[in-house]
């Protein structure tokens, strides 16, 4: 009598041993913003860059820059000169949350004020065309613990440990 195969109970079908296929590491796709590479964006004049950003950012840039934003631009240029010399620039601290991230700011570290403290953010390619304020949220989700004695009316009748 032929020997019966054991039923595994998983749909009745037997799994075949498949040979593991070697998976090649995924290549990182070259970053593009609206069809332009980062190098093209960095060489592009600011007027041309303004044409490809969304309308909200374009409107902000068209309105001009405030004195505080002008100081930030000077700090960015100074930090860019330091990186070109091979030195590591310090964190650029700023309160300007409404400043549009331009391609020349990529790679620099900013301390963006969120109303309480400066959040250190290193700008990467994907942040081009966004506002600095988007990188440092002003509100955090509060996770409360269990209420203490006297915190609620219902805790009046809870025995003290």
Curated annotation (Swiss-Prot):
Annotated GO CC locations: cytosolic small ribosomal subunit
Signal peptide region: none
Keywords carried by this UniProt record: Ribonucleoprotein, Ribosomal protein, RNA-binding, rRNA-binding
Q: Which Pfam families did the record assign?
A: Ribosomal_S19
Q: Where is this region: Disordered?
A: 1-26
Cite the GO molecular-function annotations of the record. Answer: rRNA binding; structural constituent of ribosome
Q: Tell me the GO BP annotations in alphabetical order.
A: ribosomal small subunit assembly; translation
Bias (Basic residues) ranges: 1-19
Role description: Protein S19 forms a complex with S13 that binds strongly to the 16S ribosomal RNA.
UniProt record similarity statement: Belongs to the universal ribosomal protein uS19 family.
What is the name attached to this protein's record? Answer: Small ribosomal subunit protein uS19
Question: Which species is this record about?
Answer: Methanococcus maripaludis (strain C6 / ATCC BAA-1332)
Q: Which gene encodes it?
A: rps19
């Amino acid at each position: 009598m032929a020997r019966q195969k054991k039923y595994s109970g998983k749909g009745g079908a037997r799994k075949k041993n498949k040979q593991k296929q070697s998976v090649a590491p995924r290549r990182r796709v070259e970053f593009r913003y609206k069809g332009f590479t980062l190098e093209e964006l960095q060489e592009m004049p600011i007027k041309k860059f303004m044409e490809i950003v969304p309308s909200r950012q374009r409107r902000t840039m068209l309105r001009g820059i405030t004195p505080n934003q002008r100081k930030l631009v000077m700090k960015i240029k100074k930090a860019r000169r330091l990186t070109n010399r091979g030195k590591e620039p310090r964190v650029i601290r700023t309160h300007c949350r409404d400043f549009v991230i331009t391609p020349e700011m990529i790679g620099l570290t900013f301390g963006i004020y969120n109303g309480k403290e400066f959040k250190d953010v290193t700008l990467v390619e994907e942040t081009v065309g966004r506002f600095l304020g988007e990188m440092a949220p002003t509100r955090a989700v509060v996770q409360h613990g269990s209420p203490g004695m006297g915190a609620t009316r219902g805790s009046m009748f809870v025995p003290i440990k």
